[in-house]
From Swiss-Prot:
This is Centrosomal protein of 19 kDa. The lineage of its organism: Eukaryota, Metazoa, Chordata, Craniata, Vertebrata. The keyword Cytoplasm applies. It comes from the Eukaryota. Belongs to the CEP19 family. The gene is cep19. The keyword Cytoplasm applies. GO terms for cellular component: centriole; centrosome; ciliary basal body; cytoplasm; spindle pole. It is found in: Cytoplasm, Cytoskeleton, Microtubule organizing center, Centrosome, Centriole; Cytoplasm, Cytoskeleton, Spindle pole; Cytoplasm, Cytoskeleton, Cilium basal body. GO terms for biological process: cilium assembly; microtubule anchoring at centrosome; vesicle targeting, trans-Golgi to periciliary membrane compartment.
Length: 161
C-alpha cells in the first residue's frame, strides 16, 4: 500500500496526531487519527516520536513524515498538557528554530532546510504581474530611527592596526 502524507497535526482532547494522506492506489484522500498513549507533561518528546514512528500499526502512515515533525507535534501536545496555549507554544518553538545553528546539520538536513527557505522565498516574492509590485521602491529612514553600533565601527579598534 503506497501512502503519501499530505498534512499532519495534533488534537488535544484526546491527545492524538492526525495524518491526512493520499492512498496512491485508489487516489483517495484519507484521515488517520493516531492516539498518543502514555504521554504526560513530563514525557520525552523525541523518544515518544521515535516510538510512534516505529510502531507496527502506524509506521506505514508515518514513513513520509520526518522524525523532527513528529517531535514538534509531541512538543505541542506536551506544552498543552503543561497549560500553555497553542499560540504561546508555537511562538516559543519558532524562536528556538530561528536560533538553530545550521552549521551543525547534516548535508541531507541542510539541503532540506535550504529547499524550505527557497520555497518560502518564492511564495513571498513580488513579481511584475502582482498588483502590489513597485519597481523602484525607495525607503527613507527618519531622523528618529535608532542607529545601532557595532564593535567594528568603533574608532579605537583602528588604532590597533
Amino acid at each position: 500500500m503506497s501512502i503519501v502524507a499530505k498534512r499532519c497535526g495534533v488534537k488535544f482532547t484526546p491527545p492524538s496526531i492526525i495524518i491526512i494522506y493520499e492512498n496512491k492506489t485508489s487516489g483517495k484522500m484519507r484521515k488517520r487519527v493516531i492516539p498518543v498513549r502514555n504521554f504526560s507533561q513530563y514525557s520525552d518528546c523525541s523518544r515518544a516520536a521515535e516510538r510512534l514512528k516505529h510502531h507496527v500499526r502506524h509506521s506505514v502512515y508515518l514513513e513520509c513524515v520526518s522524525l523532527a515533525q513528529l517531535e514538534r507535534l509531541h512538543l505541542l501536545l506536551r506544552d498543552h498538557l503543561q497549560g500553555a496555549s497553542l499560540e504561546e507554544s508555537l511562538a516559543a518553538h519558532r524562536h528556538q528554530e530561528e536560533e538553530e545553528d545550521l552549521n551543525k546539520l547534516s548535508d541531507e538536513e541542510l539541503s532540506r532546510r535550504k529547499a524550505q527557505m527557497d520555497d518560502l522565498f518564492q511564495r513571498n516574492r513580488r513579481r511584475r504581474g502582482d498588483p502590489d509590485f513597485v519597481y523602484d521602491l525607495e525607503v527613507e529612514f527618519g531622523e528618529g530611527s535608532v542607529k545601532e553600533t557595532c564593535s567594528w565601527d568603533e574608532e579605537q579598534s583602528d588604532q590597533e592596526f
